[in-house]
Amino acid sequence: MWLEILLASVLGFVIYWFVSKDKEETLLLGDGWWGPGSRPAAAEDESIRPFKVETSDEEINDLHQRIEKFRLTPPLEDSRFHYGFNSNYLKKIISYWRNTFDWRKQVEVLNKYPHFKTKIEGLDIHFIHVKPPQLPSGRTAKPLLMVHGWPGCFYEFYKIIPLLTDPKNHGLSDEHVFEVICPSIPGYGFSEASSKKGFNSVAAARIFYKLMLRLGFQEFYLQGGDWGSLICTNMAQLVPSHVKGLHLNVALVLRNVYTLTFFLGRRLGRLFGYTERDLELLYPFKKTFYTLMRESGYMHIQSTKPDTVGCALNDSPVGLAAYILEKFSTWTNEEFRDLEDGGLERKFSLDELLTVIMLYWTTGTITSSQRFYKENLGQGVMANKHEAIKVHVPTGFAAFPSEVLHCPEKWVKNKYPKLISYSYMARGGHFAAFEEPELLAQDIRKFMGLLEQQ
């Protein structure tokens, strides 16, 4: 006990020393060229072009032929989802995909929002841009950039968009009405992949900042989870004067002295400001540690040799579906590992899930999306300058209880000193906008209300 108190005292002093040194820094904006070859002498075409998702008989026939030739290994008895995606349930997915799923219909769903492309730093950047159908008299819409992660895509936001752009017609107050921009990270979906090494979250942040300027927004709001959280954080570090507010549902806070308090155990947690809810979500330590180990194997592969596994996944739609949908199971709720079907249809429809898979399959971007891990983590954890820079823009955070790792308010506030809103969400996991659009929309609106009171 006395040893624990001594360790807590020493760690408390270290935390105080780090916090007292706090100073505002920003990242260097810089520039880049990620297209093939050298940057041309001519100025880049800055036009914004309408884009439409399309398909063809050839694309669908090729998919069906590949699906029909699938080979599955029988699962172990009573293994459920503990060994990964259960191939007995995968048979149901395959049958639905081949015989019921209507990709042409889903293409129409994708096209219900306006799509565009524009060239930035040599890459064709895809985004959807949804404006409010109506605005209260004398009001303007708040520009909100929403950024996805892996293995997600812009489609994750389709259910939350109307709650933000047209709240009155969805049972919400029109006090906050948004104009929503959802880009695809370069190398994901319809955004062109980099031809050069080194395209990381800071490069993506700079490109999305240029996108917002090109759309005419000098000031804007940001929202993100997974990689989107890091990209939005980097935008706030690059151009804080342009970011009016930052809302996150994931916080990457590894280079944060407060995270060390996690290792002191549950009994001393209260000394460092952990609430009862924090303690429930973080402990027992062994359970959280093993969850992180179980759920991070993919990260090691993608941070080291993404192209190898990418070759397999880009050649097999069934393999791609198993690889991605397993994340939609356990990252939504780790207890879904105990279910024969991984609990996938408890939160999502098969049409929704297969649409995500098709956006990776038809664009052939699984390999380039995985490279984003190597570019960001390949030099080692805590090796990037942005990890040591705090974010000095107003921030809101939604802590969903089934997120892979819970981030207590103390952890978040150390990285984001201007945290003005921290919410323990009632339910939900990693894919917040996709799984719980109403809850996430409510928290974004709550954050905006607090922000405007300042």
Curated annotation (Swiss-Prot):
Active site annotation, chain numbering: D226, Y373, H430
Compartments where located: Microsome membrane; Endoplasmic reticulum membrane
GO biological process, one term: catabolic process
Keyword rRNA-binding: no
Molecular function terms from GO: cis-stilbene-oxide hydrolase activity; epoxide hydrolase activity; oxysterol binding
Keyword annotations of the record: Aromatic hydrocarbons catabolism, Detoxification, Endoplasmic reticulum, Hydrolase, Lipid metabolism, Membrane, Methylation, Microsome, Transmembrane, Transmembrane helix
Main location: membrane
N-terminal signal peptide: none
First-tier enzyme category under EC: hydrolase
Positions bearing Dimethylated arginine: R294
Cytoplasmic side: 22-454
Mode of membrane association: Single-pass type III membrane protein
Stated regulation of activity: Inhibited by 10-hydroxystearamide and methoxy-arachidonyl fluorophosphate.
Catalytic reactions of this protein: cis-stilbene oxide + H2O = (1R,2R)-hydrobenzoin; 1-(4-methoxyphenyl)-N-methyl-N-[(3-methyloxetan-3-yl)methyl]methanamine + H2O = 2-{[(4-methoxybenzyl)(methyl)amino]methyl}-2-methylpropane-1,3-diol; 8,9-epoxy-(5Z,11Z,14Z)-eicosatrienoate + H2O = 8,9-dihydroxy-(5Z,11Z,14Z)-eicosatrienoate; 11,12-epoxy-(5Z,8Z,14Z)-eicosatrienoate + H2O = 11,12-dihydroxy-(5Z,8Z,14Z)-eicosatrienoate
Enzyme Commission number(s) of this protein: 3.3.2.9
GO cellular component terms attached to this protein's record: endoplasmic reticulum membrane
Membrane-traversing stretches: 1-21
Record's function text: Biotransformation enzyme that catalyzes the hydrolysis of arene and aliphatic epoxides to less reactive and more water soluble dihydrodiols by the trans addition of water. May play a role in the metabolism of endogenous lipids such as epoxide-containing fatty acids. Metabolizes the abundant endocannabinoid 2-arachidonoylglycerol (2-AG) to free arachidonic acid (AA) and glycerol. Binds 20(S)-hydroxycholesterol (20(S)-OHC).
Protein family: Belongs to the peptidase S33 family.
Protein name, per record: Epoxide hydrolase 1
